[in-house]
Amino acid sequence: MIMPRYLGLMSGTSMDGMDIVLIEQGDRTTLLASHYLPMPADLREDILALCAPGPDEIARAADVERRWVGLAAQGVGELLRQQRLAPGAVRAIGSHGQTIRHEPARHFTVQIGNPALLAELTGIDVIADFRRRDVAAGGQGAPLVPAFHQALFGDSGKARAILNIGGFSNVSLLAPGKPVRGFDCGPGNVLMDAWIHCRRGEHFDRDGAWAASGRVNDDLLASLLADEFFATRGPKSTGRERFNLAWLQERLAGHPVLPAEDVQATLLELSARSISESLLDAQPECEEVLVCGGGAFNAALMARLAALMPAARIASTDAYGIPPAWMEGMAFAWLAHRFLERLPGNCPDVTGAAGPRVLGALYPA
C-alpha cells in the first residue's frame, strides 16, 4: 500500500532560500526527497523591506508575493522531475509562506505566499495560512513545530529538547508523562547574519568563524540581555519586528566603539545564553538537546551550547536520521496531513491558544 505523499515548503526568517521536502506519511513520517533553491538577492531585499513600515506596502507585498510563489513553484517542479513524479502523486503541499509581520500581542501575524496561485502553477492542492488559526484562538501563532517534534521524538522515555535555530531560535520540551511545551528563545542567527552583512557584505558567518575570532564584551552582552523579552516566560514568540539591525545599533550607540568581530562574538553569546538559560529554566532535568535548523551547522555556536549545558548531550537531529536543514519543511508537510485528516496541529501549552485547533486552509488545484 502506497502511503500518501506531501510536499512541505519553508522559507524562514533567515530568508536565504526555499526548502522543498517530500515526505511519506504513515504511522511515521518518512523523508523521501529534498530540494533547495537560493533566494535571489533582489527578492530577499524586497522581502526584508516589507518587514518594516514603508510606502506603498500593499502593492509591493503583492509583487513580492507573486515572485515568491514563482520561486516556490519552480522548486516544486524541479523536485518532482528529479523524483519522476507527476503532480497527482502528491496529496497536498503544506506551504508556510513568508512571514513579513508577526505581532501576536496585537493579535496578528502575516505570511505572504498566494496559495491560490501556487495551486494553479503546480496542479497540487495547497494547505496554507497555518499560523492565523492559532492566533485567532488567542495563541502566539508560534512556534508550531513542537507538535511535529513530539510525533517524531516524544517516545524516548527521557527529558529531551528539540532546538530549532533559524533566524530565531525556538525549543520544544519533551518529557515522559507531560504535555509538550515550547517557546521562542530569542534571536538565533538573525542578528549575526545582519551584522556580518552590514560589516563584511556576507550573508552568514560560516561555522561561526568570525565570531570565534572575537571576544565577548560583557557590558554589551548585559545590555542586549536586558531586553524584557528574555525575562518573559512562555508562551512567547518574537520576530524581526523586535530583533533587527536597528535594535542592535541602538544598543551599540551606548558603548565605546568595539571591534566588529567582538560584536559578532557577543551576538553569538547572546544566542547561546538566551537558549541555554531559557531551556534550563523550563526543563532543568534535560538530558538531551537535539538541534536542527541552520544553527546546527555553526560549530562555534554548538560548542558554546555544549559548554553552557554540560549535563545534557548536545547533538544534531542527524543523529536520529533527520537532516537538520529539512526539519521545518517536513513539519509543514506534516501539518498539511493533519489538516486533511481534521487533526489539530497546534499545542496550546506552547502557543497559549484556547485549545487544540486544526490549522490551515485548503486551496484546491
From Swiss-Prot:
Catalytic activity: 1,6-anhydro-N-acetyl-beta-muramate + ATP + H2O = N-acetyl-D-muramate 6-phosphate + ADP + H(+)
GO biological process, one term: peptidoglycan turnover
Pathway: Amino-sugar metabolism; 1,6-anhydro-N-acetylmuramate degradation; Cell wall biogenesis; peptidoglycan recycling
GO MF annotations, alphabetized: ATP binding; kinase activity; phosphotransferase activity, alcohol group as acceptor
EC number in record: 2.7.1.170
Binding sites annotated in the UniProt record for ATP: 12-19
Keywords: ATP-binding, Carbohydrate metabolism, Kinase, Nucleotide-binding, Transferase
Similarity section: Belongs to the anhydro-N-acetylmuramic acid kinase family.
Function, in words: Catalyzes the specific phosphorylation of 1,6-anhydro-N-acetylmuramic acid (anhMurNAc) with the simultaneous cleavage of the 1,6-anhydro ring, generating MurNAc-6-P. Is required for the utilization of anhMurNAc either imported from the medium or derived from its own cell wall murein, and thus plays a role in cell wall recycling.
UniProt protein name: Anhydro-N-acetylmuramic acid kinase
Species the sequence originates in: Pseudomonas paraeruginosa (strain DSM 24068 / PA7)
